[in-house]
Amino acid sequence: MSRVVITGLGAVTPLGNDTETFLNGIFNEKMGIKPITKFDASETGITVAGQVDGFDPAQRVGKRDARKMDLFSQYAVDAADQALENAGLKSAEGSENPTTVQDPTRFGVILGNGIGGLTTIQDQVIKMHDKGPQRVSPLFVPESI
């Protein structure tokens, strides 16, 4: 049997956009469910959700790369970056220390997703409906996964 050790954590959640804030929220029994503010939900019959607030993709993902990713992918990249820093495999943003070099056969990352990219899918379907299929982005599929 192989040993498995979790050495780094990262989080982008309704309770906070870093592991410390997230864990403090959990341990202090804070609620991440709040009134929906990201879109008009008045016709859905749903008024609350677990939304991520205060997320700035430019901090870790970068503006250019963020334009090519759905929001859920930006969350994943940010959380993965945090986990690498937490594990000591990457220097913190702005640090003068170089990234630590590791043997790639000695570590890995597990990331799961049920469904994502719905914002990108919705935007492209609306674009196709309103402007025709020629206006759908050729990067539609990669942007949504």
Report residues per predicted region.
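Conserved "HGTGT" condensation-loop signature of ketosynthase/thiolase-family condensing enzymes
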Residues: 1-145
